[in-house]
């Protein structure tokens, strides 16, 4: 059973249900890989071996008693901004380095109730602010495809753990591309659901109107399995929408079964915007994404030209609104109630100032300053209010585009994974999100999936964007494509290592 980490979720479910292996055996397999190989990847902040083995034994006991729930006994892990009772929840920051959550986030409790086994908490950019996972207080995460490169961010630990074969799937959060960009860099499938589809209760906030929890897996079907217990209304989250949750796995399987064998995408209109293929797009990314679109076309899809807001305008809007919300959300970390507190403060003002300046990293401080400036009395209308008006125009441009098409396709990121310690200036790093942030501003669902590789073997992602509540359609559109291609089946160098 040395290759259990190569199996899809569907095959792992089948193996557990038919007792080819137990949850304890499966959990031990993944824990052994983590303990042996994660020293060079650094994807985990906390490994909960004792809790995982207890949960695995409980899952096996439930199965022996006749419970055959789909996720029962499957190992997984959470991004470290989801509160997890009894475990460290740090959000990748020094300011929370000793914080043990007294309660579970809604998605954590939902996944636990479904029977999945949490192996621990995953590394991330500090407070989800970053695109390379180098800003974590717990050290940079390394890309399992090439350990000298970044995994993307901010959910870099989640992506790296799945790509390395440490967990079959993982949770992440996406504020401006923090699931999709790491999925692209690590050769995975990652979905950011419609805003309001998944509860944010217990998720440490970066920008509340943009944050959304989602999933990583090797395939769209893998993502669908984990998204199922996560989705749904939660009265504890004011932004959660009360709307029926589809059966994501059944929907994509049904769509695949009903599709024409030769032209499964007959009738599907894929919108392509020239704005997504302009200045700054790497030539190899461009070629692979266009090749994937050609495959969709050969499988029956119709490519139609659409127009969306210039990504540079979208980028400027995002980096006005997101830091403004972060400035407000992170004001609670003051050194008084919980988290890091400086030593021997002279007075209350010194306590606030030193606790925050010592507890927050450089990128977080930068964004707090940007946001505070945008919200200041003299500039509120000139910057924040104007950005909110532009946000409405961005949403309207997407609505206009969806009158002509069913999904919109684009590169996920302008480049493949770049080198660690590249010392990118902040603006260059921010440009890495240029194709993903519009989705968050508009509250739309989007998925990234492998579309090919560079000549040096680095993964390249294709992004599909759906209209509001078309999460299931996106999963099906990705799943059927993956039935006709094999990009998602390729394994990283770390995943191929045996122990």
From Swiss-Prot:
Keyword presence, Chaperone: no
Sorted UniProt keywords: ATP-binding, Ligase, Nucleotide-binding, Protein biosynthesis
Main EC class the enzyme belongs to: ligase
Pfam families, A to Z: Amidase (PF01425)
InterPro entries in alphabetical order: Amidase, Amidase_CS, Amidase_dom, AS_sf, GatA
Keyword Hydrolase on entry: no
Identification of the protein by name: Glutamyl-tRNA(Gln) amidotransferase subunit A
Species: Psychrobacter sp. (strain PRwf-1)
Gene label: gatA
């Amino acid at each position: 059973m040395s290759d259990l980490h190569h199996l899809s979720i569907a095959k792992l479910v089948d193996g557990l249900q038919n007792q080819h292996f137990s949850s304890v055996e499966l959990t031990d397999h993944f824990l052994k890989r983590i303990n042996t190989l994660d020293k060079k990847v650094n994807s985990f902040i906390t490994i909960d071996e004792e809790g995982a083995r207890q949960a695995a034994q409980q899952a096996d006991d439930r199965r022996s008693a006749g419970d055959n729930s789909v996720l029962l006994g499957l190992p997984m892990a959470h991004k470290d901004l989801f509160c997890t009772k009894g475990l460290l929840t740090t959000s990748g920051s020094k300011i929370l380095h000793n914080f043990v959550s007294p309660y579970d986030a809604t998605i954590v409790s939902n996944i636990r109730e479904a029977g999945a086994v949490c192996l621990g908490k995953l590394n991330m950019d500090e407070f989800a602010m970053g695109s390379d996972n180098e800003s974590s207080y717990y050290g940079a995460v390394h890309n399992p495809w090439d350990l000298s490169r970044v995994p993307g961010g901010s959910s870099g630990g989640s992506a790296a753990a799945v790509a390395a074969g440490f967990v079959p799937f993982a949770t992440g959060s996406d504020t401006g591309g923090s699931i999709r960009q790491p999925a692209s860099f690590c050769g995975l499938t990652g979905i950011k659901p419609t805003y309001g589809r998944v509860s944010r209760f217990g998720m440490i906030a970066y920008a509340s109107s943009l944050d959304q929890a989602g999933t990583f897996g090797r395939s769209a079907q893998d993502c669908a399995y984990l998204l199922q217990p996560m989705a749904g209304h939660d009265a504890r989250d004011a932004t959660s929408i009360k709307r029926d949750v589809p059966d994501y796995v059944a929907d994509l399987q049904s769509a695949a079964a009903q599709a024409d064998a030769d032209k499964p995408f007959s009738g599907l209109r894929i919108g392509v915007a020239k704005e997504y293929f302009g200045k700054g797009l790497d030539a190899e990314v461009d070629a692979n994404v266009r090749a994937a679109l050609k495959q969709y076309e050969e499988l029956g899809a119709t490519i139609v030209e659409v127009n969306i807001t210039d990504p540079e305008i979208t980028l400027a809007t995002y980096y006005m609104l997101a830091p403004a919300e972060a400035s407000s959300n992170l004001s609670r970390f003051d050194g008084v109630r919980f988290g890091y507190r400086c030593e021997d403060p002279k007075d209350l003002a010194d306590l606030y100032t030193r606790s925050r300046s010592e507890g927050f990293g450089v990128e977080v401080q930068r964004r707090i300053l940007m946001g505070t400036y945008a919200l200041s009395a003299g500039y509120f209308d000139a910057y924040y209010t104007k950005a909110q008006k532009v946000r409405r125009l961005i949403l309207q441009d997407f609505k206009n585009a969806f009158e002509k098409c069913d999904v919109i396709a684009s590169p996920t990121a302008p480049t493949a994974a770049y080198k660690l310690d590249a010392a990118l200036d902040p603006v260059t790093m921010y440009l890495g999100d240029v194709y993903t942030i519009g989705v968050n501003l508009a509250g739309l669902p989007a998925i990234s999936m492998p579309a090919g590789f560079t000549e040096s073997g680095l993964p390249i992602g294709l992004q599909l964007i759906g209209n509001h509540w078309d999460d299931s359609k996106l999963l099906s559109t990705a799943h059927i494509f993956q039935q006709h291609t094999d990009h998602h089946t390729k394994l990283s160098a770390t995943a191929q290592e045996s122990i």
